From Swiss-Prot:
Its main location: cytoplasm. It catalyses: ATP + H2O + a folded polypeptide = ADP + phosphate + an unfolded polypeptide. It is found in: Cytoplasm. Keywords: ATP-binding, Chaperone, Cytoplasm, Isomerase, Nucleotide-binding, Stress response. One of its GO terms (molecular function) is ATP binding. GO terms for biological process: protein refolding. It is an enzyme of class 5 (isomerase). This is Chaperonin GroEL. The keyword Ribosomal protein does not apply. It comes from Mycobacterium scrofulaceum. Its EC number is 5.6.1.7.
């Protein structure tokens, strides 16, 4: 029963991360798994679950604050290309994404689909 709850939690974390950020699901899944594993270990060792929850919430608050302070606005086509290239692990993909974003603008939508066409 606990394993199923933990698995559902991790699945929800990955889905929410993908919905909000579109990237980082692996990192979010690994972090969620570690939190569940260590949380259960601490509770089994006698830790107060509510105190543990409050501690996790404080840690999340601090991490969020630190990430927001270090975040940089990505505005220019070159910045978008560089950021997308890092995310995709490929400069040519980064350039394509930047070009697409430049064409549709800030409010536009870009849909990427897998093609079954070989060689095109």
């Amino acid at each position: 029963p606990y394993e199923k709850i933990g698995a559902e939690l991790v699945k929800e974390v990955a889905k929410k991360t993908d919905d909000v950020a579109g990237d980082g699901t692996t990192t979010a899944t690994v972090l969620a798994q570690a939190l569940v594993k260590e949380g259960l270990r601490n509770v089994a060792a006698g830790a107060n679950p509510l105190s543990l929850k409050r501690g996790i919430e404080k840690a999340v608050e601090k991490v969020t604050e630190t990430l927001l302070k270090s975040a940089k606005e990505v505005e220019t086509k070159d910045q978008i290309a560089a950021t997308a290239a890092i995310s995709a692990g490929d400069q040519s993909i980064g350039d394509l994404i930047a070009e697409a974003m430049d064409k549709v603008g800030n409010e536009g939508v870009i849909t990427v689909e897998e093609s079954n066409t070989f060689g095109l």
